């Protein structure tokens, strides 16, 4: 499962609902 393997790639991926996240989701993957 790619999402489980690569979750950490999104830790600093303009995260709307991730670590240090704010503002608008950058894309569908960044939505909660």
Swiss-Prot record:
Cofactor(s) this protein requires: Ca(2+)
User: What does it catalyze?
Assistant: a 1,2-diacyl-sn-glycero-3-phosphocholine + H2O = a 1-acyl-sn-glycero-3-phosphocholine + a fatty acid + H(+)
Q: Extract the InterPro entries matched here.
A: PLipase_A2 (IPR001211), PLipase_A2_dom (IPR016090), PLipase_A2_dom_sf (IPR036444)
Report the superkingdom from the record: Eukaryota
Q: Quote the record's binding site residues for Ca(2+).
A: 16, 18, 20
Output the GO biological process annotations, alphabetical, semicolon-separated: arachidonate secretion; lipid catabolic process; phospholipid metabolic process
Tissue distribution: Expressed by the venom gland.
- Annotated localization: Secreted
Question: What residues form the membrane-spanning segments?
Answer: none
Q: What is its EC number?
A: 3.1.1.4
Q: How is the cofactor bound?
A: Binds 1 Ca(2+) ion.
Q: Provide the alphabetized UniProt keywords.
A: Calcium, Disulfide bond, Hydrolase, Lipid degradation, Lipid metabolism, Metal-binding, Secreted
Pfam family of this protein, just one?
Answer: Phospholip_A2_1
Q: Is Metal-binding included in the keywords of this UniProt record?
A: yes
One MF term from GO for this chain? phospholipase A2 activity
Q: Which GO terms describe its cellular component?
A: extracellular region
Q: What role does this protein play?
A: PLA2 catalyzes the calcium-dependent hydrolysis of the 2-acyl groups in 3-sn-phosphoglycerides.
Record-stated family: Belongs to the phospholipase A2 family. Group I subfamily.
What name does the UniProt record give this protein?
Answer: Phospholipase A2
Q: Which organism is it from?
A: Micrurus lemniscatus
């Amino acid at each position: 499962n790619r999402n489980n393997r690569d979750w950490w790639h999104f830790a600093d991926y303009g995260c709307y609902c991730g670590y240090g996240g704010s503002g608008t989701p950058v894309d569908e993957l960044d939505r909660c």
